[in-house]
Amino acid sequence: DLISYGMGERSIVEIAEALRSGIPVRDITFVRGTVYKTAVQPDLPDAIRLPGFDKIATSKELYAKSFYRQYLNTDPFTAKTLVEPYPADNLFLVQNPPQKPLSTEEMDAVYALPYARAYHPDYEAAGGIPAIEEIKFSLASCRGCFGACSFCALTFHQGRIIQTRSHESLLEEARQITQEPDFKGYIHDVGGPTANFRQPACKKQLQHGACQKRQCLFPEPCPNLEIDHSDYVALLRKLRALPKVKRVFVRSGIRFDYLINDKDETFFRELVRYHVSGQLKVAPEHVSDGVLRMMGKPQNSVYRRFAKRYKELNAEMHLDQYLVPYLMSSHPGSTLQDAIRLAEYLRELGYMPEQVQDFYPTPSTISTFMYYTG
């Protein structure tokens, strides 16, 4: 068996080429971004041997060590092959290092394929998929995220190195969108996991990968972090200028701590003036600094500084636009007192949330590891 993990475009091509050349599936053990199983103990001197499944299933300490090793091996530049034994089945699970990030040209090629831009006809009988309305007229401009929130698995799926499409690729897709019969002039979103990440966190990442034991934004922005929204500003200006486009919104996650630390306010100002559809949703997640530390999020004072400036810019531009915070309850490490503080914060805002996010464990996140191990 062979599994492609992460964003598998390059892996799929390499697997197909191997099959076309006559290599049996069982011998395709060399493709990055894949996992395979074998009954023979792999002869891989540089591989990291993880504790066997039987051991991590019964020992939280060994599970913690295994997860940490996996987490440190998610970067394509530094990751090693991981081997996990399954003694009960006489098998070994082998995970090859992740694929290298796609280049801009490769990203453009992926998004230039003739997608139907619709759900499969089989869903018609069930009334379709309502969620498609939100993404049908949206543009995916980037991939990856160096935010590294504890409750998010993006580090495992897309990695911490930002990959972007070219302006022309996005403009061409936008032109295609404007030709859709039900297009009303509104591009709903231009973003990705984090909308305002359009470049790697620093130049080092392109040659050496992301730091293994240091985050880009937490607990404080790294001194090497390059904060620059100029490319995103230029892209949004071009999209706004397209014929048939009335408004271009940014609705996917804006990383407010990255934004508020940009000394150039051009993007912040244009975001408020042109790209908010009545309310801007951001994710402070909590108000207790103790919980935020567990989440890998900035201190609450950073969000308050952002919210204050957002309010000031709206007043300056004579706009009445709301700021809607995403908040999470029950995160590991949260106490009853923390929950009360969160409730009091909502009371102070006079805000009754329509949607509530209560933590639940999901695979491949630090928060789930905390939840399970205590």
Predicted regions located by residue number:
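Conserved, mostly hydrophobic/aromatic
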Residues: 1, 110, 145, 170, ...
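Short acidic, glycine/serine/threonine-rich loops at helix termini
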Residues: 15-17, 150-154, 192, 198-203, ...
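N-terminal pre-triad scaffold of radical SAM enzymes
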Residues: 124-153, 186, 360
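Glycine-rich beta-alpha loop elements in corrinoid/cobalamin-binding modules
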Residues: 2-88, 95-96, 372-373
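Conserved alpha-helical substructure of the radical SAM core
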Residues: 158-186
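Conserved SAM/AdoMet-binding glycine-rich loop
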Residues: 175-324, 328-332
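Catalytic cores of alpha/beta
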Residues: 266-267, 331-348
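N-terminal [4Fe-4S]-dependent radical SAM core
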Residues: 67-138
